[in-house]
Structures are given as structure tokens and as C-alpha cells.
């Protein structure tokens, strides 16, 4: 579904996002390799699939580190992609324009 999200954004005229780009904090430590990223704008786009409780906790810690490093994190689900695709691309577009 990450690929589907990327294709949706590109087909809606948004710039091509980086895929699984390693992001580091100010000390050079790896924070995350998000699904999609616009590094210059410090925008991270994540697809949330079916997860277990342990991975939710890890995702939350990673999101907190990204926010602490100055990234804006947008999260989407399969329902968003399948039922509200225009809302997904509109939100990413607004974030890129901010």
C-alpha cells in the first residue's frame, strides 16, 4: 500500500517523495526510514497497516523522535487510500505549501 500511496501523490501532481530515506537527528543518530519523505520540507508521510501492539509502541516512539527533530508526520490507512484519496493528497499538498 505504500506504493499505492506514493503513486496517488504523484498522479495528483505532487512532487515525488523519497522512499525509505534514512533520517538522522542533530547528533547523526538514525531516527527512522519513513515510508515517504519530503526532506527539504521536513514532511514525513507514513502508511499505517495492520499492526501488533508492540509495533504501535515502536511507531509512537519513532514519531515522537521525528517530531522532536522538526519533522511534520502525516499518517494514513488503507481506508484513507481506498475511500478518501483526494483528502490524502490534499493534506499532503497543504503540508508542502506551509
Model-derived features: where do they sit?
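Surface segments flanking catalytic/ligand-binding clefts of nucleic-acid enzymes
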Residues: 1-98
Amino acid at each position: 500500500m505504500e506504493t499505492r500511496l506514493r503513486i496517488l501523490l504523484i498522479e495528483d501532481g505532487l512532487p515525488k517523495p523519497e522512499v525509505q530515506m534514512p533520517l538522522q537527528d542533530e547528533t547523526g543518530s538514525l531516527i527512522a526510514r519513513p515510508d515517504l519523505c519530503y526532506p527539504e520540507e521536513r514532511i514525513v508521510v507514513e502508511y499505517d497497516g495492520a499492526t501488533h501492539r508492540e509495533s504501535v509502541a515502536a511507531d509512537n516512539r519513532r514519531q515522537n523522535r521525528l517530531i522532536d527533530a522538526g519533522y511534520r508526520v502525516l499518517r494514513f490507512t488503507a481506508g484513507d487510500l481506498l475511500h478518501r484519496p483526494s483528502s490524502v493528497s490534499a493534506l499532503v499538498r497543504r503540508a508542502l505549501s506551509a
